[in-house]
UniProtKB/Swiss-Prot annotation:
Cysteine disulfide links: none
Compositionally biased tracts (Low complexity): 1-33, 44-68, 97-150, 284-302, 784-803
Chain segments annotated as transmembrane: 534-554
Domain of life, per lineage: Eukaryota
Protein name per UniProt: Putative uncharacterized protein DDB_G0280071
Organism: Dictyostelium discoideum
Region described as Disordered: spans on this chain: 1-68, 92-150, 164-220, 284-306, 415-445, 779-808
Keyword Membrane: yes
Subcellular compartments: Membrane
Keywords, sorted A to Z: Membrane, Transmembrane, Transmembrane helix
Amino acid sequence: MYNNSNSNNNNGSRKRSSPPLYINNNNSGNYISPPSPLSPKQTNNFLFNNGGFNSFENPQQQSPPQQQQLLFTSPIPTRPQNLYQYIDENELNTGYNNSNNNNNNNNNNNNNNNNNNNNNNNNSNNNNNSNNNNNNKMITTTTTTTTKSNNDYKKKIKKQINFKLDNLHESSEEEEEEQQEEEEEEEEKEELNYINNNNNKNDDDNNSQDEDKEEDKYHETNTDFGLLSVASKEDLMICLNVLKKEMGQFKNLSQNLLSRLQILENGIGQEKMIRLLNNNNNYNMNGSSDSSDSSNSSGHSRNNSDENMIDCYYVTRNNNNNNTNSLLIPPAPPQLQQQQQQQQFYSQDAVMISTYLLEVQKIVEKQRQYDSLLAQREKYWDIELNKITMAILNKLGPNPSTTVDLLNLPMNNMNINKNNNSNNNNNNNNHNYNKNNNNNNNNNNDFSNFNNDDCFYNSNNSCNSEDFDSFTALNNINNSIIRNQSSNSLNLKDDSEETNFNSLKSKTNNIFKRFYIYLFGTKKTITFWKKVAIIAIIVIVWPLIANLTYKFIVYLINKRRLAKTQPFIIGNNNTSNYNSSTAIGKSLKPIKSSILVPSSSSLPSSSSSSSSTSSSSNLLLPSSINNGTNAFKKIKSSLMKKNSDISSGVGNVVSSVASNVVGGSGSGVGAPDFVKAFIQGVSTGDGGSNDNLTNNALSSITNTFGNLNTVANSSIAPSIGSGLIGSSISPSSSSSSSSSANTASNIINNFTPSALSQLNLPGSSSSSSSFSNPVSSIANNFMSDSNRSPSSSSSSSSSTSDSENGMLKLVRNLLTHR
């Protein structure tokens, strides 16, 4: 407890925010020791004992000043966040001004203090002895302290750090009595704690030894603190790179902190030596105990019985147990001058100490920042491990052969042991894990978001800050993996297909890249001649190859087209017909091309032809070939249109043959082949290669034709016979030639398949040996018969027979030449 009295010179009270840098009173040799920095060596050379220079002995003894004892109160925690507060420079300045204001008030009380030196020396010796005993007790008791709740811990830290200068010259006697009572109570508590701790010391040692053995066994079997089976080399390299990076950062930070702490320790050691030398010099110069050196160093300490105390700081102060008579003695002027000089000296020392304290606080702040950074890095490591394990599970499938066995690790047992250790913290104060857990209990602010991150852990079981560490983080990761494994197995097929596609794509890209580099090279490997060769290939060789390839393709297409359009040879196997057919086939074009005009030499002459026959044939076949073809087309169209009138006889055969030949549905002969056969028949008189069809048609005609009487008596005879006989037998002979030609043309145009199929003319068995032009032969035969018309009724029968013979020839030629 501290007496926070208000100064009269200041308007109002000062806030308890900054620690005292020095004590400004008559005995200015007393000062406050700085806080212990966070050093891994845990140096004992950092702090002074009893808060600074102790008072001298009685002037009669003339003993040298007591050597200062080093104080180490408690082990330094591994992660002490927020142990100290940063002291603002303004607060330091205000504290310095307040101390200067108090100097003026303290000068008025110098006489009282000087007159009571002898009385205070005895008290100071007693107090020093008690303080030394207290120090020894504190060294043993603070090593067995344990943690409580976070609120109590923060309050104690504030009590240790946030204190201010006590205005010792204005303290009243009542306040001093209260303080003495409190000190006595504290001493009693310390004694009780010391007794209790001694009783429990043996039990603590036994428990700690057993736990140390168990821990050593665990570390021997599990040196990596978590086995992670990695499926591929790439995942292993990712983990190693992350750890390597973090280890480098940790190493740099730790080296920086150690170097700064070493510099600070060296500076404080030098300051200590300077103070000792100055104190010895002042003692030798005075020769006797001055009032400034006869201070009562009773050594007011903090509550040493507090269980959560980490470092004990001693603030020495004067216990002004002055009587009323001491106020009347005036101070000596030389002593006053010496006191002023000493105050100036210690004011300079206070400035130096303040700089060191600021440096220490900066290092502490840096350590706190590093702790927060380390917490973030631990979170990042856990996230990366979670991603890697999930990726491995996705690759291995729902039932992998090698799994990430995090459940069977002994870390679960480790967590149980750690929980038991947290329950037995009062008996296990020297355990490193317990210290880390204690610090995590007090510094759970950095891990609060990490523990309660439901999105990351995906669990409703929140982690307590007391039990949280890397092992619990791995357990939470393991739980999230098991929980998400069923959902990830549904998307495993799509992921595998995507990975296969990506791998195939990467392989093709690599192959193309290697081929390109092999041909063209890179910017560094390509040469001038290689560039020239590439340009020559692109500009010269490639167009030539393309042109030759194009010509070859065109040649193949034309050859195939010519093979399809090769002429189909029709006719007898004689040389003349074959040559003529090939000549016609080579000269043919598509269907719309012009038809060749047959020469007069190709038409064989008949021995029975006469001048009248040639004249009549000229009437029917003009010089233009188009008229002949038009006449034949009319015959063909009439045959095609009226082929359905008669269902028996030769008409069926003729109609079927005509439909098959024209339509091409059954024979498979194309239109160009039909045209070729038609032109060949017109030009040569040959009826085509289908001789069997012609012979069958003639045989069917001979078999179906009856005698003339049946035809005359039939129903079709009047329709044909009247037109034939009536027109052919005319009484007038003057117009015989013209009427005969007109009659022949009309008969030819009026013939139908139905009429021809039922004609039964005599002499049908005799076939003409000459295959002349059908139109010309029909006209010649018919005209010769019509010119020989009888003049009397006696010759009517002979003329009728001649007309029938001409009609038979006409039908034979029509059936033969289609």
